[in-house]
């Protein structure tokens, strides 16, 4: 398996974002009792943004962002970005099915 180049990663994240709405991220945060900062970090990871860029604009250190990410992952029960995306996709599909029933 070859690693993705930057263009492929960008295309993948753009495709991913079309399916993952802010509502789904909110559901995840509510379900797992994430803090506001943990919610923001999860959104950063899902968007494909880099902590370095966010730290520069947001005023939080990379270590702080990493700690918030680790805490969110522990609460959600995932151990890496891929597991997070799988979980968010699952939650998204579940939310879509529930919305279609109502």
Identify the residue ranges that each predicted region occupies.
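The N-cap/first-turn positions of alpha helices
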Residues: 37-38
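Short, Lys/Arg-enriched N-terminal segment that forms or immediately precedes the first helix
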Residues: 18-30
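General nucleic-acid-binding
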Residues: 1-18
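Recognition helix of helix-turn-helix DNA-binding domains
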Residues: 49-82
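Residue-level marker of regulatory loop/turn positions in helix-turn-helix DNA-binding domains and
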Residues: 33-34, 43
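Basic, Lys/Arg-enriched C-terminal extension of HTH/homeodomain DNA-binding domains
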Residues: 12-14, 28, 70-102
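Short helix-to-turn junction characteristic of helix-turn-helix DNA-binding domains
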Residues: 45-49, 88
């Amino acid at each position: 398996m070859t690693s993705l180049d930057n263009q492929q990663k960008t295309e993948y994240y753009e495709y991913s974002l079309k399916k993952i709405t802010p509502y789904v991220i909110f559901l995840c945060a509510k379900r797992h009792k994430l803090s506001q900062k943990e919610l923001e970090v999860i959104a950063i990871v899902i968007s494909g943004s880099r902590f370095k860029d966010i730290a520069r604009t947001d005023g939080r250190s990379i270590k702080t962002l990493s700690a918030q990410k680790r805490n969110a992952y522990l609460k959600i029960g995932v151990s890496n970005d891929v597991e997070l995306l799988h979980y968010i996709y699952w939650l998204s599909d579940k939310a879509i099915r529930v919305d279609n029933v109502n």
